[in-house]
Amino acid sequence: MGNRHGIMRPRRLASGRSAAAAEEEGEDGEGEPGSYEAACSADPELGTFDTALRRRASRAITAVASGVEVRSLSLGSLREVTGCLLDMNQEVVRVVLACKRDVWRSPDLFDLVEDYFEGSLHTLDFLAALDKSLHRARDSQLVLHLAVQRHHHEPPAAAAASASELYASTLGELRQFKAAGEPFTDEFFAAFQTVYRQQMSMVGKLRRRKRRLDRRLRSVRVWRRVSGIVFLTAFAALLVCSVVAAAIAAPPVAAALAPAASMPVGSAGKWMDSLLKKYQDALHGHKEVVSAMQVGTFIAIKDLDSIRVLVEHLEVQISSMADSVEFAERDEEAVRFGIDEVKKKLELFMKSVDDLGEQADRNNMRLCHILPEYVFFINPANGNGMSESLFEMMNAFHDICRKDIKFKTSHYYLNFLSSSYQVYIAVA
């Protein structure tokens, strides 16, 4: 049914994915100086993040893999992978907020973090397109439900008196379902591809930034070692020469200098080391933010691939019911048989649509929790002011919540409004 109506499929993602893979392979060929495993061992917080990430990703991958084995991916798998995606996004927000002052001091890293959160705008567009598709699917579901109800609950006397009118009415409703076409339209797949391309682009930016940070960290470690050795050696040599000169000119002064000779060396060494350590700590903070965004983006790409497969699975169900409608168009006996087939498949279709709708609601609710934290992150107190993208995100999110009473009464929505109000006051 989907191919007959000319609905755009996300096949173009394959070429984009191949190009991105080739780019990543080229980057890998250069070799990354840093070791993620070593970083996890050295940094307890990063190790905890990695453990939680692996657990979430493993659960999502297992859910999808179990569906692949039986050639049937359920909406439960969709809930698992999208839940993993949004949990990862919240974790990234937590890491970024913890390092926000270091991020503000680095314009490049600030822009990178802002690009990452601007991806939430594309996610909102994707969820809005999904919501429209679900409304169309529910409308089609209602048409089929009415056709089945009329055919099976018509009084026997009325059915005998006007059988032809009954079949004509039923057939008309079945044709109305067929004419509605695919609920997943070009808009849905366009929004999907926009999110996917943005995530793939983010991967490239994060990898390049991480390599630069790795090189700087390696250099800073060498600087601390070499500068410490050279500086302290030179300082010690100066003290030795001073003591020698004093010994020649005034032996009692040399005797007094000898016990205190190590004190200035230690103080100077601590001073030099503290300067380099501050720089190294700042680089570590930057790298932690980049690593969190890099892992979150990678998981997002895998989850989007899984969502695409699950949407195609739902389309197969719709196409199967459309085939039953086509069969019912042959004659009155075929109408009766076609209605029975549609009734069998309608229950599964209704459950799939309802489950997908519930998942979309949960995704929106989680975004209600993520975006206020982003508002606090891009706080005008940092001197950069509020960007147009932030206002756009706030307005888009407000419009989505305003249209649904469930969101308007949720504490997430109220939290978002409170955060937005504080930002507007700060700007004014």
UniProtKB/Swiss-Prot annotation:
This is Putative UPF0496 protein 5. It comes from Oryza sativa subsp. indica (Rice). The keyword Transmembrane helix applies. Residues 1-14 have a biased composition (Basic residues). Belongs to the UPF0496 family. Its main location: membrane. It is a multi-pass membrane protein. InterPro entries: DUF677. Residues 22-31 have a biased composition (Acidic residues). Pfam families: DUF677 (PF05055). One of its GO terms (cellular component) is membrane.
